[in-house]
Structures are given as structure tokens and as C-alpha cells.
């Protein structure tokens, strides 16, 4: 499970696009239709698009014109985690596509994932360093569960001509986006997940207030909560995510694993390949063939281990 803060882009004037209305983002997230494809909140299962925009855009008291008014978060389970969630909800094992489920089963899976997102928004609130304990009830937010992902120009498959931009990605693609207001529901507390200065104190409306947000705390807690809530046992590579405090160390472990598996795989191919021509291709491959081989091998290793980065 990877929880992500999508950092705001800047416009041509260098001002964050999140300093304005959320209308473009809300309409973008409204793109999918079907079972369970509604905005939801802490206490509502279905919220109209117009209400989402109106409430987020009007919850900005004390914020300056150039300050972010909202943020987008996403909760992204691995395909292995999604399959586990489906089994917990429906009893069906080894599901590789939502199309194999009935409409009622899909509705149950989406509803359960919505509840998990609600839990994660509680976790998000708790990881702000404030004078009082916060919960999702203190936040103004709206979520949207999606079941599809599309290939973009950034994907290697598109760059290599194997897929076209806009093609649907295969497999289980369940995930959720959240629009969360920077201000709390009382419009007296500013909550920026970009603030890293845990423990600092600023003055807001004449009062001293603590600030800061623990990004790592939020991500790790959400990751662990999935396991606790659904009895999910993470594999070894997923456990690196919250046991290893050094990203460089984690990165090196993955790089070494990839190199080791690629070399072992090539040794096996040398043993089984016969004929002078095939041996020559392995010992003296073209740059293009090596590039394609390594890309596919690395992708397979990452998919097999369900990495959370």
C-alpha cells in the first residue's frame, strides 16, 4: 500500500495551481462512471460533484491568494493487496480482474475500500503536529475510488511502442484519490502536508500553534493498517518499506536483487540454449535486445515482489 501526496504544479506565473479552485481536479476525478463511482466523505457514501467543488472552494478563510487551498492524496494498493482484499470481501481467491466479479461483489469491494480510505484519513489527521489530537472529523475531504488506470507517455510500454497512450492497464487497478482542504472544518487551523518542521511554533490569529506533518508516519501507518485490518502479510520486499529507515540502503537491496536475478537468469539461458547462433546472441547481444530484455526482466521482478516504494 503506497499512500502518496501529489505535489501541486505551478502555473506560468510560478503560483501553485492549488491556490485557486478545485474545479478542474474535481471534474478530472469525476471521469469514471459505474458501480461505486461517486465522491464520498467521512460520513457520506455519495456526494454530488457540485457540492465537492462548492465546499472545498469556500473553505479557505485566512489563506492568502497565493497559498494552496487544497491537496490531492492517493491510496494505491498493490495488485497482491487488491487480490487479498477481494478474497476477504467476496471469498474468491486468485482474482486477477474485477470483470470476473459480479456487480454486487464489486460494490462490496469498493465500499470496503472506501472504509479503509476513511481510516487512512484519520491517520492523515493524526500525523499533523498540533496542539490537539486531530481526526478525519476535523478535516474537509472528499474521496473517489477508481478501478482503472491508463497508459501514459511516461510508461515504458508506450515509449517502446508496445502500448498506446490511453490504453487500459491490465490487472487489478483499484485505488483512490482524495481532495482535502488545507483548512480544517472550523477554518481556524491550516493543515499543510508539505510542512516538514515538526515541533515548530507559529502565530496564527494571535495564537501560538504547533505545525508540521510526518509524511513517513502517515505512509507507514497506512501501510501497516492495511495488514492489521485485513490480516494481510506483506512479503519481504514490502517489509523493507517500513523497517529500513535508509532509502539508499533499500534502493541498493533492490538493485542488487535485480542484478543477481538477471545474471542468474542469463546463466540458465546459456545452459539451455543450443546452437552456435543462439550462443552468439547471448554472448554478443545487440544493445536494443539487451535493453528490452533488462526492462522486461526488471519489470517482472518488481511485479513478482509487489514492491512498495
Regions found by a protein language model. Name each.
Residues 1-309:
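N-terminal nicking endonuclease/strand-transfer module with a His-rich metal-binding environment
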Amino acid at each position: 500500500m503506497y499512500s502518496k501526496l501529489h505535489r501541486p504544479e505551478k502555473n506560468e506565473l510560478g503560483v501553485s495551481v492549488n491556490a485557486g479552485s478545485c474545479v478542474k481536479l474535481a471534474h478530472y476525478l469525476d471521469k469514471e462512471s459505474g458501480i461505486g463511482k461517486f465522491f464520498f466523505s467521512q460520513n457520506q457514501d455519495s456526494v454530488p460533484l457540485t457540492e465537492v467543488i462548492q465546499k472545498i472552494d469556500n473553505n479557505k478563510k485566512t489563506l492568502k491568494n497565493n497559498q494552496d487551498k487544497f491537496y490531492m492524496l492517493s491510496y494505491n494498493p498493490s495488485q497482491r493487496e487488491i487480490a487479498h482484499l477481494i478474497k476477504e470481501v467476496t471469498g474468491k481467491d486468485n482474482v486477477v480482474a474485477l470483470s470476473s466479479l459480479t456487480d454486487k461483489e464489486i460494490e462490496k469491494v469498493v465500499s470496503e475500500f472506501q472504509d479503509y480510505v476513511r481510516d487512512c484519513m484519520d491517520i492523515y489527521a493524526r500525523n499533523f503536529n498540533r496542539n490537539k489530537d486531530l481526526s478525519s472529523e476535523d478535516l474537509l475531504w472528499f474521496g473517489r475510488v477508481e478501478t482503472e488506470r491508463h497508459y501514459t507517455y511516461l510508461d515504458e510500454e508506450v515509449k517502446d511502442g508496445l502500448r498506446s497512450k490511453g490504453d487500459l492497464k491490465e490487472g487489478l487497478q483499484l485505488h483512490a484519490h482524495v481532495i482535502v482542504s488545507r483548512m480544517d472544518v472550523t477554518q481556524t487551523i491550516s493543515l499543510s502536508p508539505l510542512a516538514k518542521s515538526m515541533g515548530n511554533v507559529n502565530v496564527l490569529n494571535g495564537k501560538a500553534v504547533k505545525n508540521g506533518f510526518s509524511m513517513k508516519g502517515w505512509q507507514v501507518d497506512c501501510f501497516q493498517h492495511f495488514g492489521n485490518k485485513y490480516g494481510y502479510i506483506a512479503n519481504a520486499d514490502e517489509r523493507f518499506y517500513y523497517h529500513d529507515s535508509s532509502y539508499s540502503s533499500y534502493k541498493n537491496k533492490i538493485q542488487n536483487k535485480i542484478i543477481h536475478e538477471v545474471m542468474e537468469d542469463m546463466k540458465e539461458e546459456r545452459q539451455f540454449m543450443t546452437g552456435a547462433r543462439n550462443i552468439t546472441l547471448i554472448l554478443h547481444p545487440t544493445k536494443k535486445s539487451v535493453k528490452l530484455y533488462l526492462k522486461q526482466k526488471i519489470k517482472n521482478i518488481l511485479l513478482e515482489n509487489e514492491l512498495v516504494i
